[in-house]
Amino acid sequence: MRARELRAQTLDQMKDELVKLKKEQFNLRFQKATGQLEKVSRVKQVRRDIARVKTFLRQKINENKV
């Protein structure tokens, strides 16, 4: 997910995206534990996407407070 795309999203869209990414992260961890994970790099990518979404979510919340 690109930063440009995140900036254009609303708070609700970002929250939905965060839930989706957390579910994907859970599934990837489960696949890794059972030895079924094919794309190991996806774990790192999802983790960073979660951090990116949380960062922009916090920025939007702070902008609305001011």
Curated annotation (Swiss-Prot):
One of its GO terms (cellular component) is cytosolic large ribosomal subunit. InterPro entries: Ribosomal_protein_uL29, Ribosomal_uL29, Ribosomal_uL29_sf. GO terms for biological process: translation. CDD domains: Ribosomal_L29_HIP. It comes from the Bacteria. Keywords: Ribonucleoprotein, Ribosomal protein. GO terms for molecular function: structural constituent of ribosome. The keyword Ribonucleoprotein applies. Belongs to the universal ribosomal protein uL29 family. HAMAP family: Ribosomal_uL29 (MF_00374). This is Large ribosomal subunit protein uL29. It comes from Bartonella henselae (strain ATCC 49882 / DSM 28221 / CCUG 30454 / Houston 1) (Rochalimaea henselae). The lineage of its organism: Bacteria, Pseudomonadati, Pseudomonadota, Alphaproteobacteria, Hyphomicrobiales.
